[in-house]
C-alpha cells in the first residue's frame, strides 16, 4: 500500500518531450489518456520493475507555458556507471549541464526540454534509466517526515545531514530496491519555496481507493479532491508543503 506509482510533470511540447525521453533514455510508452483539453502519457524503461515508478508527461492543449518554481527539485534515474552514462548522453546530443566531475564524481545532472532537472545516480539494482527517487524541498523537516511516515506508512531508510542542509529518503516499509523513493531536502536557513506549475504531483498506488481515502481522512490528511469528485477513479490530498499527492489503484 502507498507505493510510489509515478511522478507527473507538465510539458509545453509533447512530441519534443516524448522524443527526448524515448531517444536518450530508451523509454517506451506504457499508457496514454487523451482528453478534450489535455493528454497524459506514461513512460518508463521496457523492463521496469513491477514495483517501479513511471514518469507521467501532461500536455495541456491550450499552449500554456509553465514556471518551474523551486519546491520541486528533480527526478533521479539509475545507471551502472555515472561517467559512462553521462558520456553516452553527451555523445547522443544531450546538453551538458552538470557533469560528474562537477558533482564530486558520484552523480551528474541533465535537463529535459522543459528544464526539469534529472539526476543520474549509480545503483546496482533496477533497470537502466529507471526512476530511483524524486526530490522535493520542504520547509519543516520534522513535519514533512512525520507526514510521510504517519499518513503513508513510509520508512526513513537513509539520511544525510550536512552543515547547511539535510537529505531524507523515504519509501514504504518492505518496498523492493527497485521501487522509487521520495527525497526530502531541508535547508537550514528557513527559506520558503514556490511550487510553480511545471511539476504536477507524486502518485501513490493502493488496492482499494475508497478504503485508502478513509484511512487518510482518519489520519487527518487534507481533504482536497475525494474519490467522488474524481469520478471514483483517483483522489488527491496534499502534503504539508501543499504538494499534490494523487492516490491511484493498482
Model-based region annotation:
Residues 59-61, 122-125, 186-188, 250:
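Acetyl-CoA-dependent GNAT
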Residues 54-57, 72, 131, 182-184, ...:
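Short, structured motif recognition centered on aromatic/hydrophobic residues
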Residues 1-3, 67-72, 102, 128-130, ...:
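Short glycine-enriched loop/turn motifs at secondary-structure junctions
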Residues 2, 8-52, 136-182:
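Core segments of cupin and vicinal oxygen chelate
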Residues 6, 31-32, 42, 77, ...:
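Vicinal oxygen chelate
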Residues 181, 185, 193, 212:
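Acidic/His-leaning functional-site neighborhoods
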Residues 14, 82, 141, 209-210:
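Residues at or immediately preceding the N-termini of alpha-helices
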